[in-house]
């Protein structure tokens, strides 16, 4: 198998490039846009020449205060380091494109699995606890400026299935931040940091309307497999997943973003509740982010409403439906222009066939099956405090209703307090 790198040396080298000059001049640490600054002018010069370094850290601490499995705390973290090569600037060419290289590392412990027992992760950055290559891609326009093509090794969720505005990452639960989880839970769809070989096309009809189409390899054996961390080619390709997405962005007045999407994975899958195979599985989704109010007295202060509705294959997906809605207030106070207040509600519906299988297994073993609701529900409230241009602190509270809806376990509703720390390196 082709391996891009054999160990963590690439991640350490990239981290060293970003962090070594970090504190050469720490006097402006509270004012600069990144923690490590401009590296004595080197960083800006490299970007002007066509090489842009980026780095992001997120740390999430959660404490289960009531209900769930037990009272305790857990911490998880994500470190992302990347470099973008602008070939136009580097070689003096026109429309030569860009190359993106990204490495990711995750560490920590599972708040949902250890403390709550629910399906929707209370830490959006938990999972796949190892260092990996997460993107090696090439992007450029083709034939016309309206058509953008990207190909290589990348997470399909980087460009599809989520709101471009990023409004949902004002929350810490993975049910909100990212993409509807029934996409990846019931097909070959992959979200960051899981990457696959693929190609993505974007065609802009005008500034408001766009269509996106992609095709990605499906390789279940590489999911969460640290031995595949640096391998680009699939270990065992079972099929191809093809998403199609229509995007509308309201640009005048109160801004808005709307996405209507469909996807299909032609891999064979086992039908839930039997040994039969299903030829393919798919789903569809609707996403929206709409500003509904904007202050006339305070520039930048606005109230947004968001919504998600997603359905997956009823034959082969254990996670059949996801709905969410909520509000985000930007600039809650005149003195806090970059802060946010977010309140959201989500409902995750397990496949009824999965519940039937759980009930049948319990009866076959002479056990009673608990009386459970037909969905796991989530209420989350957070406050995003922009401490410096590069540092965000987000205290958070989550209330998980029916945590055992997916596992078929009788678990008390859980109250979880959390703190998310995000830093641009």
Label for each model-derived stretch:
Residues 72, 76-220, 317-321, 331-357:
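Outer membrane beta-barrel
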Residues 25, 30, 37-53, 86-99, ...:
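Short loop/turn motifs that connect adjacent beta-strands in outer-membrane beta-barrel proteins
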Residues 411-425:
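Outer-membrane beta-barrel "beta-signal"
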Residues 182-313, 329:
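Signature for the C-terminal beta-barrel architecture of outer-membrane proteins
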Residues 226-235, 245-247, 261-278, 294, ...:
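Outer membrane beta-barrel transmembrane domains
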Residues 55-61, 99-105, 149-155, 213-217, ...:
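Transmembrane beta-barrel strands of outer-membrane/channel proteins
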Residues 55, 81-85, 136-140, 199-203, ...:
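Residues on the lipid-exposed face of transmembrane beta-strands in outer-membrane beta-barrel proteins
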């Amino acid at each position: 198998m082709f391996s891009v790198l054999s160990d963590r040396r690439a991640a350490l080298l990239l981290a060293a490039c970003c962090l070594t000059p970090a504190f050469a001049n720490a006097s402006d640490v509270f004012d600069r846009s990144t923690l490590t600054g401009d590296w004595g002018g080197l960083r800006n010069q490299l970007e002007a020449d066509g090489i842009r370094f980026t780095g992001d850290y997120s740390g999430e601490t959660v404490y289960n205060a009531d209900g769930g499995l037990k009272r305790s705390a857990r911490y998880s973290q994500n470190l992302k380091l990347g470099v973008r090569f602008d070939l136009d600037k580097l070689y003096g060419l026109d429309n030569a494109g860009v190359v993106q290289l990204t490495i990711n590392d995750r560490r920590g412990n599972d708040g949902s699995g250890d403390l709550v027992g629910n399906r929707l992760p209370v830490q959006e950055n938990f999972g796949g606890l190892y260092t990996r290559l997460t993107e090696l891609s090439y992007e450029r326009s083709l034939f016309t400026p309206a058509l953008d093509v990207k190909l290589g090794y990348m997470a399909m969720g980087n460009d599809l299935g989520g709101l471009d505005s990023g409004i949902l990452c004002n929350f810490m639960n993975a049910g909100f931040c990212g993409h509807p989880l029934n996409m990846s839970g019931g097909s070959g769809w992959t979200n960051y940091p899981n990457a696959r070989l693929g190609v993505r096309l974007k065609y802009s009809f005008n500034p408001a309307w766009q269509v996106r189409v992609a095709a990605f390899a499906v390789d279940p054996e590489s999911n969460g497999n640290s031995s595949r961390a640096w391998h680009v080619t699939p270990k065992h390709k079972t099929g191809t997943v093809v998403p199609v997405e229509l995007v509308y962005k309201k640009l005048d007045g109160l801004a808005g973003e709307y996405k209507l999407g469909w996807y299909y994975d032609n891999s064979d899958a086992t039908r839930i509740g039997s040994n039969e195979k299903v030829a393919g599985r798919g789903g569809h989704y609707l996403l929206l982010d709409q500003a509904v109010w904007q202050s006339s007295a305070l520039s930048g202060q606005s109230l947004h409403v968001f919504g998600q509705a997603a359905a997956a294959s009823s034959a082969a997906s254990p996670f059949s439906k996801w709905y969410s809605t909520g509000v985000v207030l930007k600039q809650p106070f005149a003195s806090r222009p970059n802060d946010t207040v977010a309140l959201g509600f989500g409902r995750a519906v397990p496949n009824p066939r999965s519940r039937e299988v759980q009930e049948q297994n319990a009866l076959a073993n002479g056990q009673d099956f608990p009386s459970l609701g037909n969905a796991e529900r989530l209420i989350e409230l957070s406050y995003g405090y922009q401490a410096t241009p590069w540092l965000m602190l987000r205290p958070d509270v989550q209330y998980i209703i029916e945590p055992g809806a997916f596992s078929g376990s009788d678990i008390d509703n859980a109250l979880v307090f959390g703190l998310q720390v995000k830093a641009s390196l």
